[in-house]
Amino acid sequence: MVSKNKLYYFYYLVIDLECSSSQNIPLDIQIEKLEKLRLCVNKILNSSTERLHQKKVRYINSTGDGYFIIFDIGEDALKFSIEIHKYLNDHNEKIKNKKIYSQEEIDSKTIIVNTGISCGISKPVKQIDGQIAYWGSDVILAHRIVDYAKGGYILCSSDVYKNMKNTKIGEFVNLECSTSFKHNLKTDVYLFYNKEDKEKFENVNIHLLR
């Protein structure tokens, strides 16, 4: 039972579909991408190997072109992000290898998601429809961080790095750019990647950002 008078410390994950409303992509393809992302999230939540995800997700809500998900534990947020990117990378590879598609069709059907993760204090608030949402500057920070990413990366706040830097499932790279977002929200930004992708990311630089 959620208490509206209590403060909670959570990990906040925002998944954002890149170029979701691009005028260069037909509307039916845009909707197809949104549906594929929904199926991807649903599959991770309900897969036989990761069924415990259902218990680890505190809250989930659609943002229109992505999802906002709250986790109790930081490692669960990182694992979920890795699974999302694995699933969509496999999807993109299948599209790329289908000889029936032109390069233009491949480009339009390729699904890229950017991911932002923050952590900190939030408080439950009642929405106009009666549902409970969570509010706090650290919640907003996750949305700001995901707007900073480009090209399908997982970016984290400095607090996530401090809490999770010893995790065994991946590595953090300091992008060496202290950012100041709207409403004076500030954080260093860290790239997080799966250890299996070390060769791809070990020489990454800050130019992956906007």
Predicted feature residues:
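Catalytic/regulatory signature loops of cyclic-dinucleotide turnover enzymes
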Residues: 137-159
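Intrinsically disordered, glycine/charged-rich C-terminal tails and inter-domain linkers
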Residues: 1-2, 151-210
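Residues immediately flanking
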Residues: 15-17, 109, 119, 158
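Catalytic core of nucleotidyl cyclases, primarily class III adenylyl/guanylyl cyclases
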Residues: 49-76, 93-137
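Catalytic NTP-binding/metal-coordinating core of nucleotidyl cyclase/transferase enzymes
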Residues: 1-83, 87
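Amphipathic alpha-helical segments in well-structured domains
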Residues: 34-38, 81, 135-142, 172
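A generic structural signal for short hydrophobic patches within well-formed alpha-helices
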Residues: 20, 77, 122, 160-161
